[in-house]
Amino acid sequence: MERIFEALHEVFEIAEDAEITVEANPGTVTPEKLSAYRKLGINRISFGLQSADNGELKLLGRIHTYEQFLESYEMVRKAGFTNINIDLISAIPKQTVRSWEETLKRIIRLKPEHISAYSLIIEEGTSFAKLYGEGSPLERDLPSEEEERLMYEKTEEILDQNGYHRYEISNYAKEGMECRHNLGYWERKNYLGLGLGASSLLDNRRYSNTENLREYTECAGQPEKIRKKHRASDGGRADGRI
């Protein structure tokens, strides 16, 4: 990571107050890693928690427990980070409206600056779709449409009551702690994606790098050769997917 940051500073002028986020899996952070992140200028940590219920985490195939997340969260705070996001997912198999409310309340008590609350989307062709997709044997374990609707309403209600305002489809923040990265998508600002399969939006046109590793490495330094897809944008707001 240090080499990546060195390369970025060589090519780009990075603002002193830039928002620099690292995604972290609960249970994988260490004081040493966090110290190194701070030295590199990283100032925001985003945890992929998904749920505060260990049973739901197991159904999602997550390797961490809620207790491990709490340890990691405390570690990040002790390291001096003052901007933390927590990702959550509703409509998980066997999840109830009450268990979703409990997850929200547990997270609120931790007082993170930002919460991303997504509804589960089952992608076709995935192993998860084979288990829970339409017509699958475990489809019945998914919350009903009415339960999903209630979860959505409870999300906004509970978070709003606790000082988190909704500023984008699935994102809630304390005042002034909105994620600049998310706002960039929403406001259709230019962004540059670096790496295999990365996407960019430049002058209202989308680009996607090749997903072929050999092609990518052989054409390093020649962006016109690794950008395999491009199309004019419709000019509407982005939904956060690329």
Model-identified regions with their sequence ranges:
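C-terminal scaffold of the Radical SAM
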Residues: M1-I242
